[in-house]
Amino acid sequence: MIIKPRVRGFICVTTHPAGCAASVREQIAYVARRGPIERGPKKVLVIGASTGYGLAARIAAAFGVGAATLGVFFERAPADAKPGTAGWYNSAAFHDEAAARGLQATSVNGDAFSDEIKHKTIDAIRRDLGQVDLVVYSVAAPRRTHPKTGVTHQSTLKPIGHAVRLRGIDTDNEAIKETLLQPATPDEIADTVAVMGGEDWRMWIDALDAAGVLADGAKTTAFTYLGEQVTHDIYWNGSIGEAKKDLDRTVLALRGKLAARGGDARVSVLKAVVTQASSAIPMMPLYLSLLFKVMKARGTHEGCIEQVDGLLRDSLYSAQPHVDAEGRLRADRLELDPAVQARVLELWDQVTDDNLYTLTDFAGYKAEFLRLFGFGIDGVDYDAPVEPNVRIPNLIE
C-alpha cells in the first residue's frame, strides 16, 4: 500500500515502515562514524526502547559498543492493512540491523508499569543475557495503572499556585496563540508524580536486583528534561517539575543500592527535541522552533542520537563526566548556553503569524515531527507501495 502522512493535532495517524527503517539506519550510521565507545556496557536493558531517546540509547549501545540489548516498549502491531506504530517499525528495523551484525537483540512488548512485564523481562534477561550492566529508563506515558493498587493515575501539565498564560503555535493552523493554564490541584500533582516520578524506575531496579539479574558494577540512568527560564513555569515549577524532583530523590536511594556493588545511578538531563510528548505541550512547538533556529545558526543543533551517543561517551562511560551540583549528568549544555537562551528569549515575543517562518525554524520543527513517523527521510520513495505487515523477531508479548 502507498502510505502518506495524515496529521491530526499533535499526532500523525499514519506511519511509514520504510521511512522508520531508514531513520534507524541513519542513526546507526551516525554512531558508526563516531567510532567505538570505549569501556561501554555489554548487556543493556532499555525500558522505553522504541522511539526518541530510548531508541537512541539502544542504538548507541548496540552499534557503538557492540552490546547485547533487551528493549521494553508498548507498541501496536500492524493489522488488517492498518500500519503499526512508528515504534513498532523502529524496533523491527533495529532487530534486522542488529541481526545483520550478529548482535543479540530481544524485545518485550507490553505495559512497562505492570508487574507482568517486569517478570517477563527478568525471564528474558536470564535466558538471553544472564545479567545486565546498564539499565536505561526512558518511559514517556500520559497515564499509569499502579501495579499494587490498580488505580490509574493521569499526568497533568499545569503550573502550581497560579494560572500561567503561555505563547505557542497552533500547529494545525500555523498561527501564534496563547493558552491559559489553570493551576494544578493537589490530587493532579500527586497523580503526575505517580506517573512521571521515580517510583516505577525504583520498582524496576528493585525487581532486577531481587532477581539477581543486575551485574556487579551495573549502572542505571533515567532520562529527563529540565529546560531554562522560558520553560520553567510549565516544567520545573509546574506539576511535571514535582515529578522531576521526585526523580531526583529516587536516584539517591538507587545510587546507594548500586554503589554497594560498584555501580551507579544517575538522572541524565537531555536537550529539548521533537517527540510526540513534547508536541502536545502548548509552548514547546514555539520554543523548539526558536531553539532550532538559534542552534542551527551556531552549528550546535543536535537530535536524539547525537545527544545520547554523546551522553554515553562523555558522561556515563567517561572518567570525567559532565555532572551538575545535584549529581545529574548533563547533556543539555549547548541548549543552556546563555547566548542561546538569551536569543530565544529575545525572539520569543517578536514572533507573529506573519514572520513565523522567518524568525523561527518552524519548517524544521514540522520536518522533525514527520520524521518521528517515518516521513521525509532521504532516500525513501513515498510514492512506491510498501508492505505494512512487518514482524519483530525475538519479540515477547
From Swiss-Prot:
NAD(+) binds at residues 48-53, 74-75, 111-112, 139-140, 244, 273-275. The active site is at 235 (proton donor). Changing residue 244 to R: This mutation causes a small decrease in the affinity for both DD-CoA and NADH, and a 950-fold decrease in catalytic efficiency is observed. It catalyses: a 2,3-saturated acyl-[ACP] + NAD(+) = a (2E)-enoyl-[ACP] + NADH + H(+); a 2,3-saturated acyl-CoA + NAD(+) = a (2E)-enoyl-CoA + NADH + H(+). GO terms for biological process: fatty acid biosynthetic process. It is an enzyme of class 1 (oxidoreductase). HAMAP family: FabV_reductase. This is Enoyl-[acyl-carrier-protein] reductase [NADH]. The lineage of its organism: Bacteria, Pseudomonadati, Pseudomonadota, Betaproteobacteria, Burkholderiales. The gene is fabV.
